[in-house]
Amino acid sequence: MKVNVIGAGLAGSEAAYFLANKGIKVRMFEMRPITSHFTSRQDEKTGTHDVRNATQTRPITTTEAHKTDKFGELVCSNTLGSFEITTGAGLLKKEMELLNSLVIKAAKHSYVKAGSALAVDRNEFSDFITKTILSHPNIEVVREEVESLNENELNIVATGPLTSEKFSKYLKNLITDDYLYFYDAIAPIVEASSVDFSKGFWGSRYDKGDDYFNCTMTKEEYDIFYNELLKAEKVPTKDFERVVHFEGCLPIEEIASRGYETLVFGPMSPKGLKHHISKDVYAIVQLRKETKEGEALSLVGFQTKLTYKEQVRVFRLIPCLRNAVFSRLGSMHRNTFLQSNKLLKPTLELRKNPNILFAGQITGVEGYSASAATGIIAGINAWLKLEGKEPTTPPKTTMLGALLDYISSKEGELQPMNPVFGLLPDIEVHKKHKKLLKAYRALFDMKKFIEHHKIYD
């Protein structure tokens, strides 16, 4: 018995981990190299040092967003969202924990305080996943780019939204439908030693800890920042591509273009912090720790497609970042995903060839946790198929089951979907208690699902 897993991201790692723990041999393919041999250079004008400002001592195969050869690399934010079960992301993570999720184990191992959010040290996080996969006796890792599948073997495709061009062409021929796509943007990271901490305060919204640094801005400072942000040069897209953004992760300049106050009612809102600040504070910019030690800080909600030069110019208008050194600048990349509602069963099997299962963000789920969770389900269903049993999905009353139902049955054009409570069937109780009772029901039903299918001995 053997299963091919294509891609060593969050979903692929979860699928391989589940199968290997069931005694099934896994061949895991990852095109990113064993070593990338980057020599960092610092840009004297911008203070930036990044792999995009680096020399290479050997050619590599990678993507436009990845920087390392590690498994489960987090290319955008370093947070997996809230861990409170009355949020969609928090409930999904609790369900994943019941399913023995490798990603949740890695997140707990590399946890960085961030209020009610599950933030991680991204290096420790991916190191944990990489070491777990490489040390498993039932997993063989093959470092090469896959260009096509043996369609008679059992395959789990977890190549993510940055699937390579060659494999994308193969998939397009296989499924006969075009991919959908959206543009995703990454937020900058600054060195903590370059931040002026006299221009703000530490604290989380609604007094949930002191894990964020809040850079304060007066209305005059905000006005200058806002106008320069609108004027700033952006990275151009290809002429033939229509720019489509995911509403849950809009570039900061796109939000600003919708009106003067959209930022102060969005990522720069002082909501939940007002009793800490004086009356002349009009907006705040939150910085979140990227590592346990806090030597690197990311700009929360500041994903951007501005050119590198303009990012440095505009973001240094934020008072606490006047002399900021950027260890990573923001960037934009094109994310592709399947029209899963036309192509996949809720079990994540390809309708035209059940030997091929898909998992991860390529299926149309959005967010780290949702991507990883689909990897667990793909692994479970590959195992059931090898056991001669029917593939299955968790009940629609669970967040994971509801997500799978949504992406495989939505009418019309599919757009990426986060785990949200609106996907769950209603429950007749007072609004005040509805989310909590939905969460309890979901966890109870997930436990029954696990027991019924004997997923864990």
UniProtKB/Swiss-Prot annotation:
GO molecular function terms noted in the UniProt entry: flavin adenine dinucleotide binding; tRNA (uracil(54)-C5)-methyltransferase activity, 5,10-methylenetetrahydrofolate-dependent
Cofactor(s) listed: FAD
Keyword Transferase among UniProt keywords: yes
Keyword Methyltransferase attached: yes
Ranges for region Disordered: 38-58
Keyword terms, alphabetized: Cytoplasm, FAD, Flavoprotein, Methyltransferase, NAD, NADP, Transferase, tRNA processing
Stated role: Catalyzes the folate-dependent formation of 5-methyl-uridine at position 54 (M-5-U54) in all tRNAs.
Name of the featured protein: Methylenetetrahydrofolate--tRNA-(uracil-5-)-methyltransferase TrmFO
Protein's organism: Hydrogenobaculum sp. (strain Y04AAS1)
Gene of this entry: trmFO
